[in-house]
A protein has these predicted regions:
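RNA pseudouridine synthases
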Residues: 2-203
Length: 203
């Protein structure tokens, strides 16, 4: 049973569209923001585990300030699933490099070796949201599924760049058992606290 504090908080998932920041305010007028979504979020709502402007998919929003620490703390590993389109056909050797862990640069920490992860080739996902990048399907490319237990800033993009397969599309589909379901790009779903905590494996 969740505490009264948790019951008073609210929990949402958004299928974040391409070309939108994971925040409600920006000093630059040209950015699309979370406030542009056709949904009235309560005061104090913030995003957890942000996606960069050009990444898409599952974004958690909540008024619960404790969730960031509980979900993203380095000691609390949670599986994060992504589908990724990269340039060129990726070899099995390169896939294994990514699986084993690879050296990237982090802004605050410098050299960093990523933790072992799951990376596999997949078919083009069905029901992809439309983005005005039709040429992406015409260039030589590979679709991959990544399952990470860590979430460094722009980690997958940096990993792919190191092995010379630039990331062209990145969509987060699932965190633990919390997934997008049938949410279309730009749609929001509110979750009951009990369901939210159970699906993320949080107590």
């Amino acid at each position: 049973m969740q505490s009264l504090l948790h019951m008073e908080n609210r929990y949402f998932i958004l299928n974040k569209p391409y070309n939108m920041l994971s925040q409600f305010v920006s000093p630059y007028a040209h950015h699309r923001l979370l406030g542009d979504i056709d949904f009235q979020f309560p005061q104090g709502t913030h995003a957890i585990g942000r996606l960069d402007e050009f990444s898409e998919g599952l974004l958690i929003l909540t008024t619960d300030k404790s969730i960031t620490r509980r979900l993203l703390h380095p000691d609390k590993q949670h599986n994060r699933h992504y589908v990724v389109q990269v340039q060129r056909v990726m070899s099995e050797t390169t896939l294994q490099q990514l699986r084993d862990g690879i050296g990237i640069q982090l802004k605050q920490r410098g050299d960093y070796t990523t933790m072992p992860c799951e990376v596999n080739k997949i078919s083009r996902p069905e029901n992809l949201a439309f983005i005005d990048k039709a040429y992406l399907d015409r260039i030589e490319h590979t679709w991959l599924e990544f399952i990470l237990t860590e979430g460094k800033n722009r980690q997958i993009r940096k990993m792919c760049k190191v092995v010379k397969h630039n990331c062209k599309r990145l969509i987060r589909t699932k965190i633990e058992n919390l997934n997008l379901g049938d949410l279309k790009a730009g749609q929001v779903k509110e979750l009951k606290a009990e369901d939210f905590f159970n699906q993320l494996g949080l107590e």
